Amino acid sequence: MAQSKLDEVVSLAKRRGFVFPAGEIYGGTRSAWDYGPLGVALKDNIKREWWRSMVVTRPDVVGVDTSIILPPEVWVASGHVSVFNDPLVECLNCHKRNRADKLEESYAEKHGDKMPENGMKDIVCPNCGIRGQWTEPRDFNMMLRTHLGPVEDENSLHYLRPETAQGIFVDFKNVMTSSRSRPPFGIANMGKSFRNEITPGNFIFRTREFEQMEMEFFVTPGTDEEWHQYWIDARTRWYIDLGVKPENLRHYEHPKEKLSHYSKRTVDIEYKFGFQGSDWGELEGIANRTDYDLSAHSKHSGEDLSYFNQATGEKYVPYVIEPAAGLTRSLMCFLVDAYDVDEAPNTKGGVDKRTVLRLDPRLAPVKAAVLPLSKKPELQTVAQNLADDLRFNEWMIDYDESGAIGRRYRRQDEIGTPLCITVDFDTLEDHAVTIRERDTMAQERVALDKVADYVAARIGEKRTRVPLKPVEMGGEPWPESGVQEAGGLY
C-alpha cells in the first residue's frame, strides 16, 4: 500500500533528525517528541518570523515571557478550573476513550457536514470498528496538576498552564504602565503549555506538551469586530507569505453554540494535513474574547484592570482580540506543504526521483551547504574557510565532503537547503565556485568574494510592508488571499 504524503513527511522528519520520539531507548512516551538538530533550527526560524511579524515590525505590540506556573487563583478566575473540560466517551467493546465532539466532527466531515441523526449510536469506534457502543459522555478536566513544596495537599496544588494567554492578562496593568502603551495595543508571548489531552496523536499535531505563539490585542469596545477581521487577514497572510499554498488553507467559523465560554466569535485557520478520517486541522485560532478575561481577573483579584482615556475622559475595560498559533502545528504545516518529489538527472544520463523540501529560505534550517568536489586537501582548505566565512553572517552552514556530488545534493534537497556551493578544481584557478539552487537545480558560477552577498540576496531577508490597522480606521486593504471558507473564497 502506497504511503500518503503525510506518512512520507513523518518518515523523513524522523530519519533526518527533525523529530525523534521522546525517551525512545525506554520505549518512549505516547505523543511526546524531541526535536533534533534540524527540528530545533526550524522551530527557531518559525519563532523568529512570528516575533518579527507580531512585535519587531509593529509599533503597537510589545513582548513578555510569563511563568508556566501561576497562582491557582488565576485558573479559577479564568474559568479553566470549572469549564476547561472535554466530553469523554468510552467504547464498551475495546474500552478506548475518545472526545465525543471530535468523533461527531469526523462523522460530519465524512458525511457532507451532516451530523449523526441518532447521536453516538451512529458513530463507529475508530479503534475497534464497532458502531454505537459508547458510554454516556463524562466531563474530563484537561489541566495538568502539580504540587509546590515538600507537602502535597490542597494548599500546595498548582497547575501547569494550559495556555500562555492568562499570563498576559494578569500582567496587563504592569505592561501597560511600564511600556506606556495605550489601546489599541498588543502583548505577545511564546512558550510551553500543557494539556492532558484525551486522544493525543497525528504525529506532533496534538500533544500534551506543546508550544504556543499567542498575542492579546487590547482595543476600545465597539472597534473589536474591525480589529478581529484585521487579525484574521493578517495571520492568514503570514502563512501564505512564508510559502503555504492558499488552496491548502481554509477558515472555519465556530458555530455560536460551540464557542468557548469567553468568545464572542472565533475563526480558525486550518490546514489540509490529510489526516485519516479528517483532512483538516487547526493551525491557529483568532478569537474575540471581549472583556471577559480582564473583567474576570478584576473581579477575583480586586485589581482595577480598566483603562482611563485622559483625552476623552472615558473609562472602560478593553476588549481583546487573540491570535493564538501552535508552534509545532505550524512546523508540521510548513513541512507537509514544502514536501515534494520530482525528478533529477543522474550521472548515467537518466533521471532519478528526488525528495525535496521547498521551504521558504527564511525557514530553512540550513541556509547553504559547502561541498568540496573531492577530499583533496587543497579543496578542503578552500571549502572549510568559505563555510567559516559564511557562518560569520549567523547563517547555519553545512559542510559535506562524503559521497558523490549528486548524492550530496540529494541530502541537502530533502532537508530544504536552498543553496549548494561546490568548490572544484577550477576554483583554485579562477577563485570562483558553482552555486546550485534547490528548486530549479540551476547552477551559476560566482566569485569567492561575492558568495556571501549572493547568499544574502537569496535567503529572503527582505520583507513586504503590511497594513498596521483595519481599512475602517484608515489602513490599506489586504490583497485577496484565495483561502476558502464554507461557501466559497475568503
UniProtKB/Swiss-Prot annotation:
InterPro entries: aa-tRNA-synt_IIb, aa-tRNA-synth_II, aa-tRNA-synth_II/BPL/LPL, Anticodon-bd, Anticodon-bd_dom_sf, Gly-tRNA_synthase/POLG2, Gly_tRNA_ligase_bac, GlyRS-like_core
Primary site of residence: cytoplasm
Places the protein is found: Cytoplasm
Residues reported in the UniProt entry to bind substrate: R99, E163, F210, E211, Q212, M213, E214, E322, P323, A324, A325, G326
Catalytic activity: tRNA(Gly) + glycine + ATP = glycyl-tRNA(Gly) + AMP + diphosphate
EC numbers, comma separated: 6.1.1.14
HAMAP family in UniProt: Gly_tRNA_synth_B (MF_00253_B)
Subunit structure: Homodimer.
Function: Catalyzes the attachment of glycine to tRNA(Gly).
Protein name in the entry: Glycine--tRNA ligase
Species of the source: Bifidobacterium longum (strain NCC 2705)
